[in-house]
């Protein structure tokens, strides 16, 4: 596995933008639960790295819309592969039933903490394909 050079918060921004292309900075800040002023610094960092592109909103010139660049999409794909490999390695000591129990418990904790799937990195149920892949590797 290669080292990922983005913080979990930056990965969360990329994940949100992959599902919501063209979201405004305000929409993004609300979705991930952070002040818009802090999000601007994160968007600046992602733009500096060439992972996102910001443009002024045509209807509201005070707003900026953010989209992933091709480099951002590629980085997110690499992060996804790395995360799946890491998860597979981490969970290989558990049976499929134990993995499901762990996922259920972690989902309950995440819900209690207000974390949202698709934004907070790693917060998602494994798909049936991922579960099958994990079982094949055992």
Regions found by a protein language model. Name each.
Residues 1-38, 49, 120-123:
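N-terminal helix-turn-helix DNA-binding core of bacterial DNA-binding proteins
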Residues 6, 35, 72, 101, ...:
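Terminal low-complexity, poorly structured segments
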Residues 22, 44-107, 111:
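Charged, amphipathic alpha-helical coiled-coil/dimerization segments
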Residues 97-138:
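C-terminal regulatory/oligomerization modules of transcriptional regulators
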């Amino acid at each position: 596995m290669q080292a990922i050079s983005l913080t979990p918060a930056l990965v969360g921004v990329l994940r949100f933008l992959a599902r919501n292309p063209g979201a405004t900075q305000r929409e993004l800040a609300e979705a991930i639960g952070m002040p818009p002023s802090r999000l601007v610094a994160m968007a600046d960092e992602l733009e500096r790295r060439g992972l996102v592109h910001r443009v002024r909103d045509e209807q509201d010139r005070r707003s900026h819309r953010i989209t992933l660049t091709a480099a951002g999409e590629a980085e997110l794909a690499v992060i996804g592969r790395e995360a799946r490999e890491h998860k597979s390695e981490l969970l290989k000591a558990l049976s499929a039933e134990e993995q499901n129990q762990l996922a259920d418990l972690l989902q309950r904790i995440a819900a209690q903490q207000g974390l949202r799937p698709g934004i907070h990195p790693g917060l998602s149920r494994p798909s049936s394909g991922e579960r099958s892949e994990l079982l094949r590797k055992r």
